[in-house]
């Protein structure tokens, strides 16, 4: 997998940042899609393109990627009890949007 163009959803979060570091070390071109609800701009890595957007709007991205790592999610338990509809919107509807976009554009999802 040499020099692939890779999209990382949730790329400004803890796991996303560490994955992006590894992908860059391997020589890949990386784009991060994150709405910064929990990710931080301070986590940005040089040479990575960052898109500040919700995963539900992924359909507007040009589908010229080789691979997508889907890490965007609301993972904290307590907020899921406080606002289950938001958790469903992000974790279920958002994941479906990513999967549909990847399928239409013939992009592998990890």
Identify what each model region corresponds to.
Residues 1-110:
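N-terminal Rossmann-like NAD(P)+-binding domain of SDR-like oxidoreductases, especially those catalyzing
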